[in-house]
């Protein structure tokens, strides 16, 4: 209740069908999917750019008549910038005249690297300085996080991320990773409650049935577990092996695993958690036995 204006629903240029069903469901915001590359326009839609543009304008006019806020996806934008920039700029030159709140720029095929992302985003921002651009990364080359950061540092005002990086094919940029990098390395402020990141990750993991890798930054099971004895020893001595990603920040706590690489410091940390205290000789004996196991 009271949050409907925050719910954005994907819709299509489909003779107003999407607008109608979103309205029937009580929605107020449509993220309209248009084509950002000449190839998508002519080969998938079988339309000329002029025909596609006319259909987009008609759909937007209809959505506005229903009281909608309109955002616009330019699907395959990255390919459009690479292969058919004249088409893309022709479309944008007309679209910026319309009351579109945000333009959503996806790297649909996950083909960009950060240098390309900087180049393309800067061109968009310079050519259309009064427009709001979001960037939507895909992770096919494992560059979704890097490209998202490149985009925002080049003028993008919004980033599309997903919990646990879930998404088509290799997924999208993971929320937790993007959040901590923006905050810690660039001083960005968001409304993300970091102490809930682990909870929402587990919730989505449960509903999706897609397990989170144990070494996933921030939310993986093992990322706050120290195994090497030298690390545990350093933590005992002014937290020498800690960075800004302290587990308490995310509602978690650090653990010290026991194994063949464990040292006396690991044993002491675990004993402290259990409220136990051993003599130096006993600690040495326990450490020896643990490493043998």
Name each model feature, range by range.
Residues 136-164:
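Small-aliphatic-rich amphipathic alpha-helix that forms the alpha element of a beta-alpha
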Residues 15-131, 149-156:
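Alpha/beta enzyme core
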Residues 187-293:
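A mid-to-C-terminal "edge-of-domain" accessory segment
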Residues 37-40, 142, 165-170:
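Short gly/pro/ser/thr-enriched loop/turn and capping motifs at secondary-structure boundaries
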Residues 167-193, 197:
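C-terminal helical cap(s) of enzyme catalytic domains, especially alpha/beta-barrels
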Residues 1-16, 258, 262:
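N-terminal capping/small domains of soluble enzymes
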Residues 9-14, 132-145, 168:
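Glycine-rich beta-to-alpha transition loops that act as phosphate-gripper elements at the mouths
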């Amino acid at each position: 209740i009271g949050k409907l204006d925050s719910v954005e629903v994907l819709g299509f240029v489909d003779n107003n069908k999407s607008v109608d069903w979103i309205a029937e469901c009580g929605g107020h915001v449509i993220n309209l999917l248009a084509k950002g590359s000449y190839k998508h326009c002519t080969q998938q839609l079988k339309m000329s750019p002029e025909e596609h543009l006319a259909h987009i304008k008609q759909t937007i006019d209809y959505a506005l008549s229903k009281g909608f806020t309109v955002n616009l996806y330019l699907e395959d934008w990255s390919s459009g910038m690479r292969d058919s920039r004249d088409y893309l700029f022709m479309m944008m030159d007309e679209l910026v005249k319309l009351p579109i709140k945000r333009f959503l720029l996806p790297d649909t095929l996950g083909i960009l690297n950060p240098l390309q992302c900087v180049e393309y985003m800067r061109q968009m921002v310079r050519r259309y300085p009064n427009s709001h651009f979001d960037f939507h990364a895909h992770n096919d080359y494992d560059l979704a996080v890097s490209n998202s950061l490149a985009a925002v540092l080049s003028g993008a005002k919004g980033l599309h991320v997903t919990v646990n990086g879930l998404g088509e094919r290799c997924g999208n940029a993971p929320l937790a990773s993007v959040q901590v990098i923006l905050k810690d390395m660039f001083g960005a402020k968001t409304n993300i409650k970091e102490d809930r990141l682990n909870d929402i990750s587990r919730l989505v993991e449960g509903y999706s049935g897609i397990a989170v890798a144990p070494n996933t930054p921030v939310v993986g099971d093992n990322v706050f577990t120290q195994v090497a004895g030298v690390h545990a020893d350093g933590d005992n001595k002014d937290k020498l092996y800690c960075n800004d990603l302290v587990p308490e920040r995310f509602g978690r706590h650090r653990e010290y695993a026991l194994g063949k690489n464990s040292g006396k410091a690991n044993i002491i940390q675990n004993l402290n958690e259990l409220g136990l205290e051993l003599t130096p000789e006993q600690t040495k004996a326990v450490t020896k036995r643990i490493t043998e196991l």
